């Protein structure tokens, strides 16, 4: 067997249907579009979700939820990230300077993930319950 002798199996390939080529073809005259109506016209397409003038489903159902603009300026910080810092007093500006969070972040929350090895003083940051207890157990404290 050679690549130049390969051919598709019988019936595997179909020739495309030629539209508008006589009654005997099965697709003559109206070319499979039926008679009249919007879908029979050239250049016509019915928009997605259109239900023939009936109020469409996406407008019958109520709106819900919203996208909070705060989510783009809020982030989480792991305890394990804080133990590698050069300073022991940590606030939002320190996290930005050390490139732990991006410059546009306005709110950061410290979460319990990993172990804390050095005592830290946290100022002006949100802290989860688990992270708070871990910070206090290592001799640090949470202010504000």
Swiss-Prot record:
NCBIfam families: rplO_bact
Any one cellular-component term (Gene Ontology): cytosolic large ribosomal subunit
GO BP term, pick one: translation
Keywords: Ribonucleoprotein, Ribosomal protein, RNA-binding, rRNA-binding
Oligomeric form and interacting partners: Part of the 50S ribosomal subunit.
Keyword Glycoprotein: no
Function statement: Binds to the 23S rRNA.
PROSITE patterns in alphabetical order: RIBOSOMAL_L15 (PS00475)
Biased composition (Gly residues): 21-31
Molecular-function annotations in GO: rRNA binding; structural constituent of ribosome
Organism for this UniProt entry: Buchnera aphidicola subsp. Acyrthosiphon pisum (strain APS)
Species lineage: Bacteria, Pseudomonadati, Pseudomonadota, Gammaproteobacteria, Enterobacterales
Family according to the record: Belongs to the universal ribosomal protein uL15 family.
Matching HAMAP family: Ribosomal_uL15
Pfam families in the record: Ribosomal_L27A
Region Disordered, annotated ranges: 1-52
Domain of life: Bacteria
Protein name per UniProt: Large ribosomal subunit protein uL15
């Amino acid at each position: 067997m050679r690549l130049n002798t390969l051919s598709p199996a019988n019936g595997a390939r179909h020739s495309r249907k030629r539209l508008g080529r006589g009654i005997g073809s099965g697709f003559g005259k109206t070319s499979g579009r039926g008679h009249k109506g919007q879908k029979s016209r050239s250049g016509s397409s019915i928009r997605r979700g259109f239900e023939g003038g009936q109020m469409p489903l996406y407008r019958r159902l109520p709106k819900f939820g919203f996208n909070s603009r705060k989510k783009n300026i809020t982030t989480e910080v792991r305890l394990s990230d804080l133990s590698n810092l050069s300073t022991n007093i940590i606030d939002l500006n320190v996290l930005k300077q050390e490139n732990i969070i991006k410059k546009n972040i306005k709110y950061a929350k410290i979460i319990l993930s990993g172990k804390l090895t050095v005592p830290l003083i946290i100022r002006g940051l949100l802290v989860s319950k688990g992270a708070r207890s871990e910070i206090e157990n290592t001799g640090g404290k949470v202010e504000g």
